[in-house]
């Protein structure tokens, strides 16, 4: 056999990408976007203070970062008024959603979400064999009552 030997679950997943990045879309179009709002990027770029902080920290980039993100987690916790153990730092929303699904979902378990919500969440649920139930938007918005009703009917936690 050549190539990786995927588990049956991974082999059964569609070859679809839940989020196509703007760079991929730009290459397909053959031109750059004038505005990248879909990627949740600031049209203003980083603040001068952020640029200065990155420049000041550049000489430390030869070291691995603190895997516990101790200073960052403690700073966020202090700002938000929570304990540091209640703060999770990740590589972005895609990774954090993956952690959430791994920590809280068992195979076959009912998961309820809005139809049209963040697609990577659905991708992670499928990847961990959750049973996804979608609820339509009502008047272009989340429908909390319908979400709660679906959760109660499906036994989602």
Feature locations, PLM:
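N-terminal "arm"/small-domain region of PLP-dependent enzymes with the aminotransferase-like
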Residues: 1-63, 154
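Conserved core of the PLP fold type I
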Residues: 62-157
